[in-house]
From Swiss-Prot:
Belongs to the TMEM170 family. Residues 66-79, 132-138 are cytoplasmic. Residues 1-44, 101-110 are lumenal. Keywords: Endoplasmic reticulum, Glycoprotein, Membrane, Nucleus, Transmembrane, Transmembrane helix. It comes from Gallus gallus (Chicken). This is Transmembrane protein 170A. It comes from the Eukaryota. May regulate membrane morphogenesis in the endoplasmic reticulum (ER) by promoting ER sheet formation at the expense of ER tubules. The lineage of its organism: Eukaryota, Metazoa, Chordata, Craniata, Vertebrata.
Length: 138
C-alpha cells in the first residue's frame, strides 16, 4: 500500500503518514514527535479539518435528505458543507498556529495524540455552541 499510490495519496494518506493516531500493539511509541512549528501546525490543522468535516458532512447529508423537496431549502446542505470546509481554513489555521506557537515557545515537543485531542475538543466546543445558539432561536 505504501508504493501502490503514486502521487495521489489524498488527505487520509497524509494523516496516516504523520502518525497522528498511535498504533496499539506493535510495540512502537511516539518515535517521531512533532518538534518544529510547521509539523505541529500541520498536524493540528489536519485534525481540525477532519474533525470538522466529520460533523458537517453528516449534517449536510441529513439536510439534503430532509429538504430535498423544498424549493430553496435544499441549498442549506451546500452551506453546511461549505462551513465544514471554510471554518477550519479560517479559524482552524489561526488556532492551529496559536497552539503550535505556544508549544514551540515553551520548547515542548508535541506528541501526535495531543494534536488530535486539541482539535477534536475544539470542534466539539464549536458544535455545542452552535447547537445552543440554534436552540435559543426556537
Amino acid at each position: 500500500m505504501e508504493g501502490s499510490e503514486a502521487g495521489g495519496g489524498g488527505l487520509l494518506q497524509q494523516i496516516l503518514s504523520l502518525r497522528l493516531v498511535p498504533r496499539v500493539g506493535n510495540g512502537t511509541t511516539y518515535s517521531s514527535p512533532l518538534s518544529t512549528f510547521p509539523e505541529m501546525w500541520y498536524g493540528v490543522f489536519l485534525w481540525a479539518l477532519v474533525s470538522s468535516l466529520s460533523f458537517h458532512v453528516p449534517a449536510a447529508l441529513l439536510a439534503l435528505f430532509t429538504l430535498r423537496h423544498h424549493k430553496y431549502g435544499r441549498f442549506m446542505s451546500v452551506s453546511l458543507l461549505l462551513m465544514g470546509i471554510v471554518g477550519p481554513i479560517t479559524a482552524g489555521i489561526l488556532t492551529s498556529a496559536a497552539i503550535a506557537g505556544v508549544y514551540r515557545a515553551a520548547g515542548k515537543k508535541m506528541i501526535p495524540f495531543e494534536a488530535l485531542i486539541f482539535e477534536v475538543g475544539q470542534t466539539f466546543c464549536v458544535v455545542v455552541v452552535s447547537f445552543l445558539r440554534i436552540l435559543a432561536t426556537l
